[in-house]
Curated annotation (Swiss-Prot):
Biological-process GO terms, alphabetical: DNA strand elongation involved in DNA replication
Entries under InterPro entries matching the protein: DNA_clamp_sf, DNA_polIII_beta, DNA_polIII_beta_C, DNA_polIII_beta_cen, DNA_polIII_beta_N
Similarity-based family: Belongs to the beta sliding clamp family.
Name the record gives this protein: Beta sliding clamp
Domain of life: Bacteria
Keywords associated with the record: Cytoplasm, DNA replication, DNA-binding, DNA-directed DNA polymerase, Nucleotidyltransferase, Transferase
CDD domains given in the database record: beta_clamp (cd00140)
Gene: dnaN
Pfam family, one: DNA_pol3_beta
Subunit structure of this chain's protein: Forms a ring-shaped head-to-tail homodimer around DNA which binds and tethers DNA polymerases and other proteins to the DNA. The DNA replisome complex has a single clamp-loading complex (3 tau and 1 each of delta, delta', psi and chi subunits) which binds 3 Pol III cores (1 core on the leading strand and 2 on the lagging strand) each with a beta sliding clamp dimer. Additional proteins in the replisome are other copies of gamma, psi and chi, Ssb, DNA helicase and RNA primase.
NCBIfam families: dnan (TIGR00663)
GO molecular function: 3'-5' exonuclease activity; DNA binding; DNA-directed DNA polymerase activity
Gene source species: Mycobacterium leprae (strain TN)
Function: Confers DNA tethering and processivity to DNA polymerases and other proteins. Acts as a clamp, forming a ring around DNA (a reaction catalyzed by the clamp-loading complex) which diffuses in an ATP-independent manner freely and bidirectionally along dsDNA. Initially characterized for its ability to contact the catalytic subunit of DNA polymerase III (Pol III), a complex, multichain enzyme responsible for most of the replicative synthesis in bacteria; Pol III exhibits 3'-5' exonuclease proofreading activity.
Cell compartments where the protein resides: Cytoplasm
Length: 399
């Protein structure tokens, strides 16, 4: 075997760093590695040591991830090793310094009394990571993570319909609107941010799965930067970039038409209800135990009472009554219990307000604010301003 050839792309990289920071960085990059890579090198993570520290990166032509870690670099260079294997190893190591160095066509890793020898892959076969587009604006990472989580719950998981697997991001100056739908529910969140150009306008569709992973990585309240380009370069590269906290990632934009969602949001309601989120959630989970595969939970709204029911004679029935503030004509409507509890978990408030039109049309859920006053007059009731809505299609009632 030609050892010179098997060692192509490796270098005398040698470094030492804390186990915890190494494991965290490798695990974050490894999350984005493909399960079934089209070529073997795409299953690897690239480790590059320089005067500025250690950089760990991964790329599968769709998503790139790169993180910088503080490390003592004894010798600069780059090496490519299996990402998931390295992630498994670093997470299992004792909490002691990790020593890592290239040894011929392998790498040696030691931590305490544990020693590993891992094969390397050819660095020169690894694709070059894309350049982050120009910065567009920033916002706190915890705000970004919360907003993404609130809308991603409604994103589709059928990848034959790519327009439903993304999160629509609309930017107009200092306002960002996020939206996602799987045809059965729609979630929309509006938030403010610091934009570099006050007249910036853009609309893109970003894979929801990637956004969720990226958002979860930074929830400490530090700033996160969103990059779409600037001026005539907005979206030109077909990339969406996110950076912050020493981490940066890019993902290719989805080339698909997102549904025109605003026309789906009702401007007024014929009936409205306000109820405690925790009580309603627990009651839904309880009565849904007799629902056939989560088929439906029925909600009967009347004067001060909400009756939840589920099931049928052949599988069993369940009912529970809850106190509710309700105004409008008595209403019976049914929902998929899983979709309903998803919405309740996403409003992020102690109480939730429902807006109804008819039992066959979508209901609107929104967080109840401290300033809300439940109406006592006859409808119709105008939809109130809110920074979050969850629109849910009902299930057809039997008969």
């Amino acid at each position: 075997m030609d050892l010179a050839k098997t060692n192509v792309g490796c270098s005398d990289l040698k470094f030492c760093l804390a186990r915890e920071s190494f494991a965290s960085a490798v695990s974050w990059v490894a999350k984005y590695l493909p399960t079934r890579p089209t070529v073997p090198v795409l299953s690897g993570v690239l480790l590059t040591g320089s005067d500025s520290g250690l950089t760990i990166s991964g790329f599968d032509y769709e998503v790139s991830a790169e993180v910088q870690v503080a490390a003592e670099i004894a010798s600069s260079g780059s090496v490519l090793v299996s990402g998931r294997l390295l992630s498994d190893i670093t997470r299992a190591l004792p909490n002691k310094p990790v020593h890592f160095y290239v040894d011929g066509n392998r790498v040696a890793l030691t931590c305490g009394s544990a020693r590993f020898s891992l094969p390397t892959m050819a660095v020169e076969d690894y694709p070059t990571l894309p350049t982050l587009p120009d910065e567009t604006g920033t916002l706190p990472s915890d705000v970004f993570a919360e907003a993404i989580g609130q809308v991603a719950i409604a994103a589709g998981r059928d990848y034959t319909l790519p327009m439903l697997t993304g999160i629509r991001i609309e930017i107009s100056g200092d306002t960002v609107v996020l939206a996602a739908t799987d045809r059965f529910r729609l979630a929309v969140r509006e938030l403010k941010w610091s934009v570099l150009s006050s007249d910036f306008e853009a609309s893109v569709l970003v894979p929801a799965k990637t956004l969720v992973e990226v958002a979860k990585a930074g929830t400490d309240g530090s700033g996160v930067c969103l990059s779409l380009g600037a001026g005539v370069g907005v979206g030109k590269d077909g990339l969406f970039g996110i950076s912050g906290g020493g981490k940066r990632s890019t993902t290719r934009l989805l080339d698909a038409e997102f549904p025109k969602f605003r026309q789906l949001l009702p401007a007024e309601h014929t009936a409205v209800a306000t109820i405690d989120v925790a009580e309603l959630t627990e009651a839904i989970k309880l009565v849904a135990l007799v629902a056939d595969r989560g088929a439906q939970v029925r909600m009967e709204f009347g004067d001060g009472i909400l009756r939840l029911s589920a099931g049928a004679d052949d599988v069993g029935r369940a009912e529970e009554d809850l106190a509710v503030a309700f105004t409008g004509e008595p209403l019976t409507i049914a929902f998929n219990p899983n979709y309903l509890t998803d919405g309740l978990a996403s409003v992020h408030s102690e109480r939730v307000s429902f807006g109804f039109t008819t039992p066959s049309k979508p209901a609107l859920l929104r967080p109840t604010s401290n300033d809300d006053v439940h109406p006592t007059h006859d409808g119709p009731f105008p939809a109130l301003p809110t920074d979050y809505v969850y629109l849910l299609m009902p299930v057809r009632l039997p008969g």
